[in-house]
């Protein structure tokens, strides 16, 4: 079971305790710090939509430290990021692999960051296939469709050709922070919040 830290704030009317994620949300910070599952996606989407309703123009910061996860869950977050009217600053801390890398690249261009020792990885979708021969054919066709779909998204986000994305994704394709800049996944390596375009990363 994951332990969620609580922080205590002095509100002027006394002290108030809240979980750390709620406190970060006050600063328009959303954290993706685990495998990307449907429940996690629903939570992240709800946070993003809440922040949009609070202020549709102010930047949102999304910090990613994830090994990836379910494609449909990741695409739901991706579509929501694109749906928002405000800029979304993405940060890789630790790792952004698979769907995590796609979400990292989905941030507003010029505002996609990685910390110096971060690692990023892209690869083709995979899944266990069981059932009748007809079921197996359908699932295999769906995986191929998703492979092309994800390659198109990464191509749009990175500027790489679809063909190169597909070729590189045939195996786990790892990148360090500087390599991720060259690839187009991120725009800048930062070691301090002062290095970003958002001077209010943490208030």
Curated annotation (Swiss-Prot):
Give the GO cellular component terms, alphabetically: cytoplasm; endopeptidase Clp complex
- Source domain of life is Bacteria
Which EC number(s) does UniProt give? 3.4.21.92
Q: Catalytic residues? A: 98 (nucleophile), 123
Identify a single GO molecular function assigned to this protein: ATP-dependent peptidase activity
> Can you state the subunit structure given in the record?
Fourteen ClpP subunits assemble into 2 heptameric rings which stack back to back to give a disk-like structure with a central cavity, resembling the structure of eukaryotic proteasomes.
HAMAP family noted in UniProt? ClpP
| Keywords, ordered alphabetically | Cytoplasm, Hydrolase, Protease, Serine protease
Could you tell me what this protein does? Cleaves peptides in various proteins in a process that requires ATP hydrolysis. Has a chymotrypsin-like activity. Plays a major role in the degradation of misfolded proteins.
Say yes or no: keyword Iron present.
no
Localization, per the record, is:
Cytoplasm
Where does the UniProt entry say this protein principally localizes? cytoplasm
User: Which family does this protein fall into?
Assistant: Belongs to the peptidase S14 family.
Pfam families according to UniProt:
CLP_protease
Disulfide bonds, paired cysteine numbers: none
Q: What is this protein called?
A: ATP-dependent Clp protease proteolytic subunit 2
User: Biological process GO terms, please?
Assistant: protein quality control for misfolded or incompletely synthesized proteins
- Quickly give the catalysed reaction: Hydrolysis of proteins to small peptides in the presence of ATP and magnesium. alpha-casein is the usual test substrate. In the absence of ATP, only oligopeptides shorter than five residues are hydrolyzed (such as succinyl-Leu-Tyr-|-NHMec, and Leu-Tyr-Leu-|-Tyr-Trp, in which cleavage of the -Tyr-|-Leu- and -Tyr-|-Trp bonds also occurs)
